[in-house]
């Protein structure tokens, strides 16, 4: 036990007689064993806490320090509790009294343990290792048995704390990263079914994209071509002035209400549309008609359209008007009775009719621009909706009345019943003509606006609201202004030829009066029969719309003069 005395002396503790440590060696061993048991209990408690807090791995490294902390700090407060040990300590080493004034629970070996810890100032966890080394050093002393048993007991406590870390499974990064060699590693930018060479696997995503874009597959080439085609379509439709795609095709819909709402919220695409809108506003100011705000007019137009769609004019009224027109066909009275029929649909529409009429006129199957509109045309003018009992006939008649410019070409007389509606109708017809010519390429546009005979027959049936077998087809054109009939500019042969082209049998009355005006064709149809030039080339004076009724020849010249307005 000389090593213990040497260790104590190095710490400043003077040992007295040499026989003291030999007598108290067994007591020291017992005390140390009790201390080891206490440490084991603390370790068990810490293990239970660590098991409960296993979810927080940062706590796994904390358990070792607390068990080591009590021995150095606990030896001094535990001292005053055992006065009998103090006498043994005083007898064993007389110098312990002045160095440690209080009485200690452990005799001289415990201070020697503290002395060994005082030399290397390390973490408290190192407490166990110097203890084992201390007893190993003491094993060379005169009592190997007493010194040899504690090392096993003292070395046992340090083993449990690492077991907490052993419970955590270590991740083998090499085995986990082995999946990088598989094809699934490249699932982000390539199909997993394709196999690659090692050089292809080593490519970065950017290099891979560059390689694929430089060497496209047939599928990618086809996709690229289709995308370019779509982009070109969108670009050309956006660039062309008032082309069917930009102003019409994008606004096609299956319901009439949608068409009207789109036309009311029409967007000005280019300069031509701006000019058309400016003309409309100028005419409305000239007639003192559009004095109200744009919001009120749009609201009234939507209300009038909705009321018109619900069938404000019954079938009996249509039949009555058609009978009147049959009588009026021989002697042409003033057209006052007809004008109120158009007024429910035109009273509150300052400008939306123009674009809807353009849209409807270009939907004909004979259009040179978009034959794909046949579906829309068949949907609107189907020959199945010809019985007088069905509501679609009424909406077809309303749509036809808005789409065909002849119906909006009634003279602006100063009759009482036409004070409201006639300015709108004449203005709409004029702006329709100007919009057609302002778009450019007049002849092709005129021909594209002429409906085919079959479609014209459908239109005639839908306006008349009766089957062909019941009445003569001539009544189908009851809503066309009779002033156009007596047009001196239209030879009778032209009217007969055009009317025979429509597939409708010509009655005997056709020989006495011009039928061209009754055939429900738009005015551009004059270019079919020999004169391919539009009538806008003839310079004629523009007439004011606020004049008393004129003879038929002056009205026809006024009608042709409207064509000149859109050519500026």
UniProtKB/Swiss-Prot annotation:
Chief place where the protein resides: cytoplasm
Comp. bias intervals (Acidic residues): 316-329
Asymmetric dimethylarginine, modified sites: 471, 543
Positions carrying Phosphoserine: 243
Cellular component GO terms held in the UniProt record: cytoplasm; cytoskeleton
Location within or outside the cell: Cytoplasm, Cytoskeleton
Domain of life of the native organism: Eukaryota
Keyword Phosphoprotein (UniProt): yes
Keywords annotated in UniProt: Coiled coil, Cytoplasm, Cytoskeleton, Methylation, Phosphoprotein
Ranges that cross the membrane: none
Bias-annotated ranges (Polar residues): 235-245, 385-395
Listed Low complexity bias regions: 75-92, 246-255, 291-307, 366-384
Coiled coil: 21-56
Feature: compositional bias, Gly residues: 139-149
Location of region: Disordered: 1-22, 59-92, 139-162, 235-256, 291-403
Described purpose of this protein according to its UniProt entry: Microtubule plus-end tracking protein that might be involved in the regulation of cytoplasmic microtubule dynamics, microtubule organization and microtubule elongation.
Quaternary structure note: Interacts with MAPRE1, MAPRE2, MAPRE3 and CKAP5. Interacts with ZDHHC17 (via ANK repeats).
Family the UniProt entry places it in: Belongs to the SLAIN motif-containing family.
Protein name, entry field: SLAIN motif-containing protein 1
Protein's organism: Homo sapiens (Human)
């Amino acid at each position: 036990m000389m090593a213990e005395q040497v260790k104590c002396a190095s710490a400043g503790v003077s040992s007295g007689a040499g026989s003291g440590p030999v007598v108290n060696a067994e007591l020291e061993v017992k005390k140390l064993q009790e201390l080891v048991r206490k440490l084991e209990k603390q370790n068990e408690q810490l293990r239970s806490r660590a098991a409960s807090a296993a979810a927080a791995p940062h706590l796994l490294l904390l358990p070792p320090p607390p068990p080591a902390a009590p021995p150095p700090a606990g030896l001094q407060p535990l001292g005053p509790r055992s006065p009998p040990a103090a006498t043994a300590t005083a007898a064993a080493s007389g110098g312990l009294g002045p160095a440690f004034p209080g009485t200690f629970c452990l005799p001289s070996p415990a201070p020697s343990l503290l002395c060994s810890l005082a030399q290397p100032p390390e973490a408290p966890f190192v407490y166990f290792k110097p203890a084992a080394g201390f007893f190993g050093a003491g094993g060379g002393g005169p009592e190997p048995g007493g010194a040899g048993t504690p090392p096993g007991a003292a070395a046992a406590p340090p083993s449990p704390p690492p077991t907490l870390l052993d419970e955590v499974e270590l991740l083998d990064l090499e085995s986990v990263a082995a999946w990088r060699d598989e094809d699934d590693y490249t699932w982000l930018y390539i199909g997993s079914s394709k196999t690659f060479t090692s050089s292809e696997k080593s490519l970065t995503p950017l290099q891979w994209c560059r390689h694929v874009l430089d060497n496209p597959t047939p599928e990618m080439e086809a996709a690229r071509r289709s995308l370019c085609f779509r982009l070109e379509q969108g670009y050309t439709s956006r660039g062309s002035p008032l082309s069917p795609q930009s102003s019409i095709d994008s606004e096609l819909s299956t319901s009439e209400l949608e068409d009207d709402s789109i036309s009311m919220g029409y967007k000005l695409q280019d300069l031509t549309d701006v000019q058309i809108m400016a003309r409309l506003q100028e005419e409305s100011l000239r007639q003192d008609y559009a004095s109200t705000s744009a919001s009120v007019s749009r609201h009234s137009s939507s209300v009038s359209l909705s009321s018109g769609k619900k069938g404000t004019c019954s079938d009996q009224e249509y039949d009555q008007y058609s009978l009147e027109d049959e009588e009026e066909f021989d002697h042409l009275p003033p057209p006052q009775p007809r004008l109120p029929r158009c007024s429910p649909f035109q009273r509150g529409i300052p400008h939306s009719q123009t674009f809807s009429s353009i849209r409807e006129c270009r939907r004909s199957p004979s259009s040179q621009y978009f034959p794909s509109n046949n579906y829309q045309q068949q949907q609107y003018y189907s020959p199945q909706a010809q019985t007088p009992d069905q509501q679609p006939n009424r909406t077809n008649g309303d749509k036809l009345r808005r789409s065909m410019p002849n119906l909006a070409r009634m003279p602006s007389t100063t009759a009482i019943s036409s004070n409201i509606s006639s300015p709108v109708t004449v203005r709409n017809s004029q702006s329709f003509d100007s919009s057609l010519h302002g778009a450019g390429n007049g002849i092709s546009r005129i021909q594209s606006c002429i409906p085919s005979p079959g479609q014209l027959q459908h239109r005639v049936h839908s306006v008349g609201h009766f089957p062909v077998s019941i009445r003569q087809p001539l009544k189908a054109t009851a809503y066309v202004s009779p002033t156009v009939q007596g047009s001196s500019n239209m030879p009778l042969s032209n009217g007969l030829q055009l009317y025979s082209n429509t597939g409708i049998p010509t009655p005997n009355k056709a020989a006495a009066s011009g039928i061209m005006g009754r055939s429900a064709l738009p005015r551009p149809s004059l270019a079919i029969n020999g004169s391919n030039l539009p009538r806008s080339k003839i310079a004629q004076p523009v007439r004011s719309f606020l004049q008393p009724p004129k003879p038929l020849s002056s009205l026809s010249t006024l009608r042709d003069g409207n064509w000149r307005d859109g050519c500026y």
